[in-house]
């Protein structure tokens, strides 16, 4: 067969294979066109799940009569004109092929009127050459697109359509996603003559929450946290649920600059944040909106525009992880037990440990507070990914004669993690339950006590955090040596406010809005002059503050703590503050009586 130019109808049908998958695909293209036209009311009418009729009417700007024929032509659009326009796409549509593709596999009629016209015009395309006919019509300002008999001329495609109920479910879900993307737009849905969905405009926060309830259910809204964070041109806001929901429907909606997407990078960031905070894997529920400079995101990478590509993908990923993680930690800390492992301070001398090698490579210089703060450098941004995804560091140890030899793990196997806090293990015929919070507290006590000379290592924050400290800046200057040793780096802001730039690893995964003020309140009890004795006393008391030591662990972090315990603590098997044997006597007696 010789090479030849395809006829217009065949070329459009090939393009429709990517654009028009099912009735929901048609509605997506038409509703997005309405949103781009500035409509604040969109009415969608269906018959037979959209297979027989789709009608989308809006009150947008409309299309003038002289451009209706072009609107049905391929690659004709008013949204982009030059290559530069592709670098900062702000509209939902931009390829100019949706109407042409839809009209090639259906009987499509386009009716529109602009505010400057006295009458409306109607256009439709038919025949092998897709010739467009335009005639006068009656219509208010806005546009109506009517699609009849979808896939009537492509029987193979029509056979792949599902039942009326299934196709309507896809459309219902699509309009739910669109309704959550534009709270200011009224969207109504009729099916077979019945009004089934009516999303009213939502301007205030309470009205927006009501639309979320309508779209996602009351359970999600009752459990959801409202987040709103902005940094370095990235703005993330929306709702997320800290706990699994019992509802069958998944609530997982992401929007980038108002465009609904399903992006692997965003999904990974969200799941990572949940995993780090909960230690478990479950289906999180969220509605999140990310806004950034259109120059920093490429939306022209997927046929249906469901995926995007970020120019600074690592920065976007880490920003999302940190914002969500901070919100979840705040929620979890409110419900966490107030007391952390008691008795650390008194029992500390009874825990002989191996001496530690100094982890710092040099003395950290303390900078005098300044009036502002600068954005992280490029090298800092590249390091944030490692800082944000790593576990709390374990302690490097140097063995000397007399230190405890690590036992053979096969003789003391780990069985399972209980309530994300307790580790069940076994030796011979005895079961043991270890308190991971107590072990973690001891690990940090050991590390902090050994860090007096070099101080705790300061790790930069991706998002500098503004805090109210209820103390004048002069007080901070007096305790400058203490704050330097504790790894806290900050810049002054307004009176009794500071911008936190870097924190020690111990604080990095906590709710710093509460843990740092609590640390400063504790520090106020100690003299300005720093000594070994005061340092050890402060650290032991500091570790008891609520919200500092995590109460949820993954199996990997639990095993890491278990290994540290065996290698660094003498006579750990007999330390009842760290672990206890499980008494099975009563249970065995019951079984023996049976």
Curated annotation (Swiss-Prot):
SUPFAM superfamilies: ATPase domain of HSP90 chaperone/DNA topoisomerase II/histidine kinase, DNA mismatch repair protein MutL, Ribosomal protein S5 domain 2-like. Pfam families: DNA_mis_repair (PF01119), HATPase_c_3 (PF13589), MutL_C (PF08676). GO terms for cellular component: mismatch repair complex. GO terms for biological process: mismatch repair. GO terms for molecular function: ATP binding; ATP hydrolysis activity; ATP-dependent DNA damage sensor activity; mismatched DNA binding. It comes from the Bacteria. Keywords: DNA damage, DNA repair. This protein is involved in the repair of mismatches in DNA. It is required for dam-dependent methyl-directed DNA mismatch repair. May act as a 'molecular matchmaker', a protein that promotes the formation of a stable complex between two or more DNA-binding proteins in an ATP-dependent manner without itself being part of a final effector complex. Belongs to the DNA mismatch repair MutL/HexB family. This is DNA mismatch repair protein MutL. It comes from Tolumonas auensis (strain DSM 9187 / NBRC 110442 / TA 4). The lineage of its organism: Bacteria, Pseudomonadati, Pseudomonadota, Gammaproteobacteria, Aeromonadales.
């Amino acid at each position: 067969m010789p090479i030849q130019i395809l006829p217009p109808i065949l070329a459009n049908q090939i393009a429709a294979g990517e654009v028009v998958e099912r009735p929901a695909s048609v509605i997506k293209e038409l509703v997005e066109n309405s949103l781009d036209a500035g409509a604040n009311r969109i009415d969608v009418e269906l018959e037979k799940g959209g297979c027989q009729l789709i009608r989308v009417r809006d009150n947008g700007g409309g299309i003038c009569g002289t451009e209706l024929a072009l609107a049905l032509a391929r690659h004709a659009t008013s949204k982009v004109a030059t290559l530069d326009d592709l670098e900062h796409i702000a509209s939902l549509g931009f390829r100019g092929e949706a109407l042409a593709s839809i009209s090639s596999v259906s009987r499509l009629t386009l009716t529109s009127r602009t505010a400057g016209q006295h009458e409306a015009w109607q256009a439709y395309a038919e025949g092998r050459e897709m010739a467009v006919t335009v005639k006068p019509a009656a219509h208010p300002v806005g546009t109506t697109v009517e699609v009849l008999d979808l896939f009537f001329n492509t029987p193979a495609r029509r056979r792949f359509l599902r039942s009326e109920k299934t196709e309507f479910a896809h459309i219902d879900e699509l309009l739910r996603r669109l309704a959550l993307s534009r709270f200011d737009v009224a969207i109504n849905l009729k099916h077979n003559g019945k009004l089934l969905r009516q999303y009213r405009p939502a301007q205030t926060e309470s009205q927006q929450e009501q639309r979320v309830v309508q779209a996602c259910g009351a359970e999600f809204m009752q459990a959801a946290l409202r987040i709103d964070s902005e940094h370095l041109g990235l703005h993330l806001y929306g709702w997320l649920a800290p706990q699994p929901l019992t509802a069958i429907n998944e609530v997982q909606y992401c929007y980038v600059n108002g465009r609904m997407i399903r992006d692997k990078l965003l999904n990974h960031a969200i799941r990572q944040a949940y995993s780090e905070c909960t230690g478990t894997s479950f289906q999180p529920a969220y509605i999140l909106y990310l806004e950034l400079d259109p120059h920093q995101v490429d939306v022209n990478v997927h046929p249906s525009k469901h995926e995007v590509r970020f120019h600074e993908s690592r920065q976007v990923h880490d920003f999302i992880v940190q914002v969500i993680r901070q919100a979840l930690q705040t929620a979890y800390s409110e419900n966490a037990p107030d007391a952390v492992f008691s008795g650390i301070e008194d029992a500390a001398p009874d825990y002989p440990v191996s001496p530690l090698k100094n982890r710092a490579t040099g003395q950290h210089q303390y900078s005098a507070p300044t009036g502002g703060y600068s954005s992280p450098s490029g090298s800092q941004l590249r390091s944030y990914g490692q800082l944000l995804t790593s576990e709390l560091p374990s302690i490097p140890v140097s063995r000397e004669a007399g230190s405890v030899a690590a036992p053979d793990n096969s003789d003391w196997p780990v069985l399972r993690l209980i309530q994300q806090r307790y580790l069940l293990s076994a030796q011979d015929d005895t079961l043991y339950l270890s308190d991971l919070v107590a072990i973690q507290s001891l690990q940090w006590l050991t590390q902090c006590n050994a860090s007096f000379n070099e101080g705790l290592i300061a790790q930069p924050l991706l998002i500098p955090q503004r805090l109210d400290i209820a103390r004048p800046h002069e007080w901070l200057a007096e305790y400058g040596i203490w704050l330097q040793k504790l790894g806290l780096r900050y810049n002054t802001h307004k009176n009794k406010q500071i911008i936190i730039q870097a924190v020690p690893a111990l604080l990095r995964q906590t709710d710093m809005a509460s843990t740092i003020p609590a640390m400063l309140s504790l520090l106020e009890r100690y003299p300005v002059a720093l000594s070994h004795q005061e340092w050890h006393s402060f650290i032991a008391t500091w570790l008891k503050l609520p919200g500092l030591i995590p109460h949820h662990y993954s199996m990997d972090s639990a095993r890491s703590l278990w290994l540290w315990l065996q290698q660094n603590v003498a006579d750990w098997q007999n330390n009842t503050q760290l672990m206890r044997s499980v008494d099975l006597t009563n249970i065995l007696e019951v079984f023996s009586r049976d």
